Amino acid sequence: PSNYIRNEIRLFAIENNLEYLNQRNHEGLLRTLMIRTASTGEIMVLIQFFEENKVQRELIMNHLAETFPEITSLQYVINSKANDTLYDQDIKLYKGRDYILEEMEGLKFSINAKSFYQTNSDQAYELYKITREFAGLTGNEVVYDLYTGTGTIAQFVSKKAKKVVGVEAVPEAI
């Protein structure tokens, strides 16, 4: 579904003269697009606008909400900074929830726009299984998951460890 959404945004932007950000002269509206699709089928779409233009913003957000009712979380942010980082930005919920649910081995994870999470859910699952296997846990260890993000790795190894401690510096990433 992410390619359909991405392509629709591109087509809609062209048809409605919505300009993409030009990094050199700092002009334009559309900055970046983040689409997350969980293995549960839930979809998060976050559009980063360079400047506030309520008419154009609502035009594209309404179009997405109507064209793709399957979007679980539709969000946007106005970011006029020199970089694209989101952690210090105020993300606005346009429609749905401000998170999507990911599920692996019966464990459920809430993923929000600022969560650190692997971009490929299927490969993340394989990576976590290998991580758990390589750890060779016997059930007596205390495991520290530094920069834990959503805590997926910590939770994966928790079944085979005495105790797991997740440490994260960015509260919104949890």
Task: Show which residues each predicted segment covers.
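Short, contiguous clusters of charged residues that form electrostatic/catalytic patches at enzyme active sites
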Residues: 7, 11, 28, 125-129, ...
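Short helix/loop segment immediately N-terminal to the Walker
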Residues: 20-27, 143
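Extended interfacial segments that mediate partner engagement and assembly in macromolecular machines
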Residues: 1-19
